[in-house]
Amino acid sequence: RDSSSALMAEALDAGAEPVFYGIAPDDEQAIAELVHRAVQECDFVITSGGASAGDYDYVTALVRREGEVLFDRISMRPGKAITFGLLGGKPYLGLSGNPAAAYVGFEMLARPAIRKMRGFAEGARPVQRAVLTHGVKKRQDRRFFDRATVSRDPETGELLVTEAKTQNSALLGTMQRAVSYT
């Protein structure tokens, strides 16, 4: 899965000057070398993949060992596996390697941070009120960012939001069609 290409475009859109260091092999030393290089050359380091607890998820351990992890999980879905901390005195954000989770993590955390660092008054994308076209069960355990499409009621002009039927974060088709989160 390639989360990086889409995130590079989003970082550029947010006002950053993204630098791509390639896709690292599942090798702790190779990953450490790329992250160290990014810390030397960049003001804010964002990685995708390696932020969870799998056999090849080395990045959080690296930040914990050489910097300071401020948090390594967040109560949202998709995107629970996120690491944020300081590495070499610079902010570090480790996003999930899952494309949908990486995108949501970027939108909710990286975009506002980049825009603030660049001096923009508004950090996040604009929020608009809309009417859901169907009922949604409220969930208390975490914040859900369900992909949705938006339309306009031809009679009233109201914005209408329809959640995608499938929210599996591995399915990219719903991401391609989504223009909103509920």
Where is each model-derived feature located?
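Glycine-rich beta-strand-to-loop/alpha-helix junction loops that act as flexible
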Residues: 45-62, 69, 96
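Loop/helix-junction capping segments adjacent to catalytic residues or to phosphate/diphosphate-binding pockets
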Residues: 28-29, 53, 103
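Flexible glycine/proline-rich
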Residues: 64-182
